Amino acid sequence: IGRADGGNHDGHARRRAQGLVSRDDASRLIVFCNNSGPAFIIGAAGVGVFGSASAGFFLYAVHILAALIFGVIICPKAPCDICYDEDIFSPVSFSAAFTASVKRAADSMIGVCAFVVAFSAINGVLDAMDITRSIAGELSYMLGAELSWCAALLAGILELGNGIGSMTGLAISPINLALAAFILSWGGLSVHFQTFSMIAGTDIKTARYMIGRFLTALIAAALALLGAAAIF
């Protein structure tokens, strides 16, 4: 579920390019296998934001459950089209495999850092121009929510880390945990553009990916809202 799979969208793209999976299966994979790890959710979101490991474990459980529920929804009876053509797998020397893996890992790492920095900068510019505050104010008026809550939502839509970090100081409550669950499952536009860069050149459907992440985030928020009301 992302962690077990490694969240390796570059790997999904290569498998699709090699014909190992169908386009529909690859499109499902990038939605389903795109989740935050337990260290970030429990440590950064739970302990760092809410000062509670219990809240972190709760958010992680909601995060995984939402992914599982969405996975069942999108392919309840979908066939798994896997190619077992042995000709696709050719022997490679250890030195060549090691060199290629290090290069691909470095490229992915640089790409991830670049998108995080870019969207953090965009977030900073929007804050400096008071655009975020203005939009948050409108949302606060329409939804009847706190200004800081709306500002965190907007930050989380752009970049996951900034969104979760913006929630620091908010109390443990169903509505705040629901917001954290939404941001964690949505992932942020920064993560989405990282995914797009990895699957570029393939026929994997990006529209399904965006819709899937948004629906998963809504499921997570609903689960957190209901669960937190009973637990916290």
Task: Locate each region found by the language model.
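Hydrophobic alpha-helical transmembrane segments in multi-pass membrane proteins
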Residues: 40, 67, 71, 108-120, ...
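Alpha-helical membrane segments and immediately flanking helix-loop junctions
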Residues: 1-50, 153-170, 177-202
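C-terminal transmembrane helix pair
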Residues: 39, 64-68, 173-232
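Alpha-helical transmembrane segments
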Residues: 55-71
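Helix-coil boundary and interhelical linker segments in multi-pass alpha-helical membrane proteins
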Residues: 47-56, 170-174, 229-232
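Transmembrane helical segments that form the transport core of multi-pass membrane transport proteins
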Residues: 102-180
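Intrinsically disordered, low-complexity non-transmembrane regions of multi-pass membrane transporters
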Residues: 78-104, 137
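Transmembrane helix-loop junctions in multipass membrane proteins, especially transporters and channels
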Residues: 52-53, 71, 75-83, 128, ...
